Amino acid sequence: MVECPSLIQPLLTGKANEGKSMFRSVKNHSIEYLESPLLSKCDFLTHAFCTRLGGVSENEYASLNISFKEGDEEGKVLHNWNRIAMAFAIPLEQFLVVNQVHGDDVLVIPPYGDFFSTRAELNHDAIVTNRTNLAVCIKTADCVPVFFVDRIKKIIAVVHAGWRSSALEISAKVIRLLREKYGSAKQDILAAIGPAIGRCCFEVDGTTADAFFNQKNNEEFLFSCFGTNKWILDLAGANRRQILNCDIPEENIDVADLCTSCRQDLFFSHRGSGGITGRQVNFMMIKGDAPCRVLTIGDEYPRIQ
């Protein structure tokens, strides 16, 4: 098995491991989160890969759990969302979370107008938009959060890349959409891969490994445990390779290189916890004047549930 590097000092001091881009640790009010140095250069952008720190949830959900669906108390989850909204000065109704169904469907949100009327219409694992003042969110607890930004056209995309979505090459699909629909140039697309389960902790069976065998350069992220039907899968590495295979320059890619399973002091981990845990939020938003608000659904907390 591959050992996870000790990252507590680089995380706290901002010093990078040799040859790696280290995300910055930021504390805003009680909320602790990470920023990509690459994306931080885009002055039109707000982004955060949140940790589990700074909320009010308890026990397995301590403390900044943002999921209403994992068994936590609804009041505490809503309190956590309100803390995030206050820390970033973003009204709660401007956050949007999709349902995340472990597929490769992409929700494209136009700059103006309505885009959903029921939660069932939000069964997607990626969002692409050029709408301002809409914080598009991905929930994670081991899966890979991938952010894309067209730094010239001011278009953003957030991707939930678990192993199934990664096997479907969802990151590559989003890049193709940016280039074909919006005319994004490959040199203008930036990518940031957030904290996720590392290859140090992600042993999979042959059935899961089979889903990646046809991917180009899979020797970089899929490793056989010789003499067994077990494999080591580097999910962040698989998505990085998809991005490179789309001809995005290597210098346009940031990787957090933090394992959520090893660092359960900082992150929720489904595998590391045995399955009972919360979810951290990862989000991006294009700054600017908010478009005319359109009421789309009658549920009390429709955008974040």
Label each residue range with its predicted role.
Residues C4-Q305:
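Active-site microenvironment for binding and transforming phosphate-containing groups
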